[in-house]
Amino acid sequence: MINRILIRIKVLQIVYSYYQKGNGDLKVAENELLFSLQKSYDLYYYFLLLIIEVTNLQRRILDTRKCKYMPTDEELNPNTRFIDNRFVAQLAENDTLKKYVDEQGLSWSNDEEFIKNVLNTILSSEIYAEYLKNEEDSYETDREFWRQIFKKVICGNEMIEEYLEDKSIYWNDDIEIVETFALKTIKKFEEKKGSKQALLPMFKDLEDKAFAIKLFRQSLLKGKEYRERIDKHMKNWETERIANMDLIIMQVALAEILSFPTIPINVTLNEYIDAAKYYSTPKSGTFINGILDSIVNELKKEKLLLKD
């Protein structure tokens, strides 16, 4: 689930933090990186749990209304399609989800007001109204309802994103990426797979985890060497006016260019130029592109870089 885009973001953040703290302990910083990646994976499960929690809350609300003094006919006989959703019932029994949630201690139990706000947002949506009116009653309809809710109501919702950012500092830059993986998971669910339905693993393969660790280590262990090369190519720039994050981005980009021969140079450059646009100044992308392009040409002339 954790792709290389997210890995690069996390490495940049931890390398930046490492220097801000005054060149701390490398092993401690590496553990912080792995912890940060684990938190991204937690968020994936929190999104899946959110579906179950809002359903459970609505079930409790309907049950409470039935038991109140002099309930109306509508309260005694509510439309239960939302709480009887077959996709949600399957998700709630998923073996992998239950195991991970139990092991990591994940829960929305202290966030009832937030869950209530999410539920109200869903219940007031046109998607919900259409779902109740839909004459087709099937597992596919139930799953599609939640796919649409997640895509159009939850993803990009400012209230939800702000709450998640406040809930964990590790999620500030993860939400949009992790939302796409939760959405893909909903789409892949099949009724016949029951509780054995596969969820996304933390890493697609061991190679991605190794990529994260190696990129981080090389960025710091050879940081002095990379900084000297960067400084040489910035002689026409006013160094004191260059954002510190620009230097970090170029340093990590060089670590990737020189440490991973199978990754095309243009792929690496594009990824870090995009990161610069997001994490640094508006002009950083152009500046970083120019410096890195100059360094790459120099490395090729020195026969230190043999890939394209």
Model features per residue range: what roles?
Residues M1-D308:
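Class I Rossmann-like S-adenosyl-L-methionine
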